[in-house]
Amino acid sequence: MSSFLSKRFLSFSQRAMSQESLKFKSLIYSSHDSQDCTKVLKVHNYKPKKGSETSIVLKTLAFPINPSDINQLEGVYPSKPDKVTDYSTDEPSAIAGNEGVFEVVSVPSSVSTLKPGDKVIPLQANFGTWSTYRTCDKESDLIKIEGVDIYTAATVAVNGCTAYQLVNDYINWDPKGNDWLVQNAGTSSVSKIVTQIAKAKNINTLSVIRDRENFEEVAEILEKKYGATKVISETENGEKEFGKEVLPKVLGSNAQVKLALNSVGGKSCANIARKLSKDGLMLTYGGMSKQPLTFPTGLFIFKGLKSHGFWVTENSKRDPENKIKTVNEVIELYRDGKIISPKEDIRALEWDVNNASDEEVLQLITDGIKTKGTKNMVILKW
């Protein structure tokens, strides 16, 4: 048999396999519940009504349970997937999950950039990642990932891209090493990636973390392992004496604090804003305290403070090419050893695809949603 015919036969066999033997099992929802979103989730077994023969078939390797996923189930997130009847459901439904990493199982003959075995992530949110398998009509809706572990691949679209764009897309940095950024929530996964990306660009970072008994131990990890230039407590962040006497010595005489990254809100936000130099920029990408942003009026009038929101999902919709560029550059930083994933923040939950019952799968996801204070990631065992 010729090489061409062999490839065509293999492609046909792979498509046939995807239609007949693959068991599609997904976490779906058709309604929302702002009080207990786990009540709207169901495990659904089905064969896709369309697309499996002419589409790219993907096997899920891992997906995180992100706050945005939970907010979608609650019905309070601005970005929501369309509810459809493509999954053989009685009523229009959506598959939960925005982020994850997949392995290509099969491709139609029209696809030239992907092959079975390739690792990919979705280009956009609302992909429906909480599933054993997915189909995708267009190869342009996927980003190929090479050379990183599944933990990194499964989180690069949100945490990795957020950190990279916060550091790189808004400020013209001086490469001489006098520029600073300040951020709260310094122990968060995004903040740990921010400090590493900044260090690779010769940017200094001042990371603010909550007061705690083991402050020195945590600060040492953030500085030595994740590259923060200096870690301070929220108490120090709010002290006038610290700001006047200690901080100038930390920053140095020629320092310019050009960027403040806020994911907390409330007083913490106001206090990091005070550390900005003239014409500094505040970017807000979260609000963990659930307190409104409060800024001293004088920062706007006399220091020219600028304050903007940041939403990586909207950035990706507005400029898909920049999303692809961002992912590729973040992956390159990982491969070059300039940044590492904060894997200690991740709690792995194993989904035994071949042995777990529907009830066990639902309980696994429910536990992941309800367990707070850690990043839960579901790893599919095949």
Curated annotation (Swiss-Prot):
Top-level taxon of the source organism: Eukaryota
Record key words, sorted: Fatty acid biosynthesis, Fatty acid metabolism, Lipid biosynthesis, Lipid metabolism, Mitochondrion, NADP, Oxidoreductase, Transit peptide
Descriptive protein name: Enoyl-[acyl-carrier-protein] reductase, mitochondrial
Protein's organism: Kluyveromyces lactis (strain ATCC 8585 / CBS 2359 / DSM 70799 / NBRC 1267 / NRRL Y-1140 / WM37) (Yeast)
Matches recorded under InterPro entries: ADH-like_N, GroES-like_sf, Mito_Enoyl-ACP_Reductase, NAD(P)-bd_dom_sf
Molecular-function GO term, any one: enoyl-[acyl-carrier-protein] reductase (NADPH) activity
Lineage: Eukaryota, Fungi, Dikarya, Ascomycota, Saccharomycotina
Keyword NADP assigned: yes
E.C. designation(s): 1.3.1.104
Cellular localization per UniProt: Mitochondrion matrix
Quaternary structure note: Homodimer.
Location of the active site: Y77 (proton donor)
Name of the encoding gene: ETR1
Amino-acid positions noted as binding NADP(+) in the UniProt annotation, renumbered to this chain: 159, 187-190, 210-212, 285-288, 310-312, 375
